[in-house]
């Protein structure tokens, strides 16, 4: 008699995705981040749900309700610290997951890759509206500055901004709708993740060599289920360590001050995981140009599959492309540093150079290098 997990309508879907899934036997630890992102999402949804039970989305009580969660709710301080730092771990895993996809040429699975870029945008949007909810100084001014960027669009800009605000400034209506979006979007992300997995399982996973691995595949369980479990343990130890020992390490001190529309903080900046995009935005003197550069800094990922010129899939056997990949990583670190610095010399110039290098690597250097490597190997 056939096993129930292979015949039951629901269990056979789970079986095909997590148990009997044929998996390349040589995938490295860089392939762990997909499951870690799933864990991050579940952690964020659960901690967020418990926070939402005690939070009030009203400008007169939002800040106090967060303080109340930390002081009076059982383990509220822990739930809040895990949720706040969970976002940082989420983005660390996201950026490493994208970097793995770029290094090993996983972007050639176009449907999976494009859904992934949409997931990245959705996650960034969720994190942005979530940062506004505690209604501290940086929450308020971050919301004001970033939403105001939409006014750069010709004709419809001002109307668009007021429509998003629900009034003539960031106010109660803004906070209420941002809370609604912050609650809703993680479930949209969960749904999009299912589609991401569906597309991935149409083709199967890539592997570090970039070659077809059909001849050498193993079942996902027990080999990679235990490998994922090991990754879960490491990440949860890291997350709880940060949440317990230095919960405010990655936050902004300005957010301990309740929002005040009459006092502007000296340096308005987003959370650390958005600093690279913020640096690109600031490096262009024109408002509309900055907004478009900000958008394109993420959307450029959608062009990567189209700009792939090499006859080889990954960077494993392509030393020149490896150098450029690590140059891109270094460039993103420079942009992250610049995003947190004040707008003055020499930071402005460094930001402009780093932004130019960022787009030049994606649009010119990487495609050109792929073509050059083909020539060097006589692969016309």
From Swiss-Prot:
Keywords: Electron transport, Heme, Iron, Membrane, Metal-binding, Mitochondrion, Mitochondrion inner membrane, Respiratory chain, Transmembrane, Transmembrane helix, Transport, Ubiquinone. A ubiquinone binds at residue 201. Its cofactor is heme b. Heme b b566 binds at residues 97, 196. One of its GO terms (biological process) is mitochondrial electron transport, ubiquinol to cytochrome c. The cytochrome bc1 complex contains 3 respiratory subunits (MT-CYB, CYC1 and UQCRFS1), 2 core proteins (UQCRC1 and UQCRC2) and probably 6 low-molecular weight proteins. Component of the ubiquinol-cytochrome c reductase complex (complex III or cytochrome b-c1 complex) that is part of the mitochondrial respiratory chain. The b-c1 complex mediates electron transfer from ubiquinol to cytochrome c. Contributes to the generation of a proton gradient across the mitochondrial membrane that is then used for ATP synthesis. Belongs to the cytochrome b family. This is Cytochrome b. It comes from Acipenser transmontanus (White sturgeon). The lineage of its organism: Eukaryota, Metazoa, Chordata, Craniata, Vertebrata.
């Amino acid at each position: 008699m056939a096993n129930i997990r292979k015949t039951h309508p629901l269990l056979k879907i789970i079986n095909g995705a997590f148990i009997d899934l044929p998996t390349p036997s040589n995938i490295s630890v860089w392939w762990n981040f997909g499951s870690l992102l799933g864990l991050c999402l579940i952690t964020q949804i659960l901690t967020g749900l418990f926070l939402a039970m005690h939070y009030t989305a009203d400008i007169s009580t939002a800040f106090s309700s967060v303080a109340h969660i930390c002081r009076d709710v059982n383990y509220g301080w822990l739930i809040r610290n895990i949720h706040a730092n969970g976002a940082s771990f989420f983005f660390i895993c996201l950026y490493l997951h994208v970097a793995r996809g770029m290094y090993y040429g996983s972007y050639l699975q176009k449907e999976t890759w494009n859904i992934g870029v949409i997931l990245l945008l959705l996650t960034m949007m969720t994190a942005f509206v979530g940062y506004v909810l505690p209604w501290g100084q940086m929450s308020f001014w971050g919301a004001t500055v970033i939403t105001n960027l939409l006014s750069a669009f010709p004709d419809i800009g001002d109307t668009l901004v007021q429509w998003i605000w629900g009034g003539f400034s960031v106010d109660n209506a803004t906070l209420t709708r941002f809370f609604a979006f912050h609650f809703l979007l993680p479930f949209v992300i969960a749904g999009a993740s299912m589609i991401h997995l569906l597309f991935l399982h149409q083709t199967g996973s890539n592997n570090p060599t970039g070659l077809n691995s059909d001849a050498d595949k193993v079942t996902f369980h027990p080999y990679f289920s235990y490998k994922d479990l090991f990754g879960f343990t490491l990440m949860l130890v890291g997350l709880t360590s940060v949440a317990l020992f230095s919960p405010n390490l990655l936050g902004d001190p300005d957010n301990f001050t309740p929002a005040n529309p009459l006092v502007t903080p000296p340096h308005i900046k987003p959370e650390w995981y958005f600093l690279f995009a913020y640096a690109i935005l600031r490096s262009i003197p024109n408002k509309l140009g900055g907004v478009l550069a900000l958008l394109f800094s993420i959307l450029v990922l959608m062009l990567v599959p189209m700009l792939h010129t090499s006859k080889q899939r990954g960077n494993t056997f392509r030393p020149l492309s490896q150098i450029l990949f690590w140059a891109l990583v270094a460039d993103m670190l420079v942009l992250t540093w610049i995003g947190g610095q004040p707008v003055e010399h020499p930071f402005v110039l460094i930001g402009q150079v780093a932004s130019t290098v960022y787009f030049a690597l994606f649009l010119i250097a990487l495609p050109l290098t792929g073509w050059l490597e083909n020539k060097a190997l006589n692969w016309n």
